[in-house]
Swiss-Prot record:
Keyword rRNA-binding: no
GO biological process per UniProt: DNA recombination; double-strand break repair
Gene3D superfamilies: Nucleic acid-binding proteins (2.40.50.140)
Annotated Gene Ontology cellular component terms: bacterial nucleoid
Similarity annotation: Belongs to the RecO family.
Keywords: DNA damage, DNA recombination, DNA repair
Function recorded in the entry: Involved in DNA repair and RecF pathway recombination.
Protein name: DNA repair protein RecO
Gene name of the encoded protein: recO
Cross-referenced InterPro entries: ARFGAP/RecO (IPR037278), DNA_rep/recomb_RecO_N (IPR022572), NA-bd_OB-fold (IPR012340), RecO (IPR003717)
Entry annotated with the keyword DNA damage: yes
Pfam family of the protein (one): RecO_N
HAMAP family in the cross-refs: RecO
Residue stretches in coiled coil: none
Amino acid sequence: MSEVKIRGIVLDSLNYEENDKIITVYSDEFGKLSFIALGANKASSKNNYSLNVFSESDFEIFKSRKTQSISKLKTGILVRNNFKIAKSYNNYLFASIISSVILQEELFYNKDFKLFDMLREAIRNINDEVNPFSNMVWFLFYSLKNFGGYWELNKCYRCNKASKIYRKFDLQHYGLVCPNCINENEEEHDYEFIKYLQRMDNNTFFTIQKFPINVSFEIIISKLLFSYYLNEIGIYSYPMNEILKKEVYKDDTFWEYTHKVLTKNSI
């Protein structure tokens, strides 16, 4: 094992034997990795605060040579505790959904500084009550590509042609529909919703932060993202399943809400 220094966001903490913990972080230098923190459960441990879930910390570790093997913690220094996340159930749920995506077993073991920056910004914003719900939505949207996920927002998904105007976003197939391809029995969508999706697609996690937020649109987008991650990509996320128990996400309520929001200003 070689000794290395990393900065990481703590994603998971698991008790191991009586006094030890297994900590999983997403780091700036190596992506996702896990290490054993010996004695971390002792009251006298100097590493306690740096190991709390959602904390941002500097770590010195003895890194395993194998990517998915357990490394060993030498020291941890807290940079930012993000403890306010735990004071709000909703914010804790939002942050947990983000961490559950990165904790998928076979992914994120390589260095990706853009993802690290995005994760750090999302966790900080949720902690600081800076559009916490939107930061979760944006993180999920901009992480789709890491799973090979894709929503067609540049052309009609049916005829594969670009159009100046689109009549709807197909909520089942995650793609835009042009005037030539929409069926007579289909409802057209509010053009502002279509522009909202396209604006997200044309920006990044960081640049989208400066634009006005439409919470009604983002409630719909969040439900679509949860369904896409769970059903199309096939990930397992306990916090996603928990948030889907909220009344607004229940099928009857959601589709009634969606109809009301998306058919208000169609072209």
